[in-house]
Curated annotation (Swiss-Prot):
Annotated catalytic residues: D27, N79 (proton acceptor)
Known EC number: 2.5.1.-
Protein's UniProt name: Isoprenyl transferase
GO annotation (BP), single: polyprenol biosynthetic process
Keywords carried by this UniProt record: Magnesium, Metal-binding, Transferase
Family: Belongs to the UPP synthase family.
Gene: uppS
Origin organism lineage: Bacteria, Pseudomonadati, Chlamydiota, Chlamydiia, Chlamydiales
SUPFAM superfamilies: Undecaprenyl diphosphate synthase (SSF64005)
InterPro entries in UniProt: UPP_synth-like, UPP_synth-like_CS, UPP_synth-like_sf
Binding site for substrate: 28-32, 48, 76-78, 80, 82, 199, 205-207
Molecular function in Gene Ontology: ditrans,polycis-polyprenyl diphosphate synthase [(2E,6E)-farnesyl diphosphate specific] activity; magnesium ion binding
Pfam families in the cross-refs: Prenyltransf
Source organism: Chlamydia abortus (strain DSM 27085 / S26/3)
Amino acid sequence: MSLTLKQADQASLSMQSLPKHVAIIMDGNRRWYRQHQAQCSIKSSSGHYYGAKVLPNIIESAFSLGIEVLTLFAFSTENFLRSAEEVAELFSLFHAQLDEQLPYLIENKIRLRCIGNLLALPPDLQQQIAKVASETQRHGMRELVLAINYGGKDELVRAFKKLHHDLVNKKISLDSVSEELIRLYLDTSEIPDPDLLIRTGGEMRVSNFLLWQIAYTELYVTDVLWPDFKPYHLLDAIKAYQHRSRRGGK
């Protein structure tokens, strides 16, 4: 995104109603690859290589526009059911993107946080995630959150197991259990719930993503497939968000 476009579009946004936390379901890589396979110079098992090329521009654009937390649904618990070739490609891309984004995150004082069942990931990927998280942990004003091996139902199961453990060991009482207490056991306990959830690829579902956290989140679905998603598509989503009236169930 050019500096001119950033300046013009930033001026068109209302800073008072800017979403603080934007989450994105990055869907459509495989459909995009089927449509463009003949023109692709890099052969990919599923198109994720081309989806990954979009990431740096979207990440930079989101934070330059004033977004404080950007959460990306990178790999679901169900994705392990895909072919070994596709899963291996995704893990390889995670390694590459973590290496590529680290200097940007450090330079711009952005913290990396990963959510999900990380213990089920390959040990080398766990180590790299821990390294990048450690090198950016002193930053807290802005955060890039990657959901890796994440599922909303799985998160709740893990949270309730931890809560049950504390109940049994009398660290908490049954009377103390509340929505706010449960929230403290979630992967996202230290970040606000999303204000805006964007889904690319046109599918009208949330795909087991942040089920607890998106109770009052504004949803925006675009038919644009993820590898075609540009900064101006992100801006369109934010502008649509700013024209809505958020009532939080009231």
